[in-house]
Amino acid sequence: MNTQDISKEWIDTFNHLGSEGKLKAPVDYHAIFEADELFGKKLYTLPMGYITLPTGRIFACDPLTHLAAVDNKTYIRTVNPGTYPIETKVAELDTDYYRYVLTRVLFKNTKPVQYELALKGHEDLNELEDGESYIGFPVDAGLATLVDEATVTAYREFDRHWYEQHPDGNIYDDYFDELFKLNAIAYPKFQRPGGDWINFKIPNTDLYVPMIQSGFGDGLYPVYWAFDEAGDICQIIIEFISCSSNE
């Protein structure tokens, strides 16, 4: 756990909330990934390739509005550097009408036995003590990503260079829009014609930025670490659509 620059008060509150079970996920996400149906809706699993994590320090954000920001912080927990598969659970809400429910990265082929809210060390934990069910990351452009700290550095350089070449441009309309459409042609399952996901390879690198439709669009989305029986982190999960019967 990376606790550098985090106050003792925050760490004490984090540990207290953990002991009270207030950092736990409301559902077993692994069971949902194994299921074919949720609340009467068919579920499908959509592989999205792989992402490389050179440092193992990661976080989730909206790639269009936050990835190039200068104040991004990673989660306090870290994983072993490596290349890992990423996949999304898709719900068919109506005939040929799909929405993405969960996205996960798999670090180990072990079964999760518990989940913990992913945090960065600067959040107001009083929200959880006061009854809020989770703290999440904001989405303002309808997309989400999970990336490594090193990927952020590479993406910022790509973004800076692109805008130098296109000072009056819009990077989504003038660059990513076409990539989403091409991906929908190449992988039409569970996508609208304009595209609902890409696994973007940053030019001149081996680093990928998955950009994934965030459920019903803009909002605040929680991220959870999954731990196996040995206490090792085996997955990280973004929840786009609530999987809890209590909501």
Spell out what each predicted region is.
Residues 1-19, 149-247:
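Acidic, proline/glycine-rich low-complexity IDRs
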Residues 4-182:
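Extended, low-hydrophobicity segments enriched in charged/polar residues
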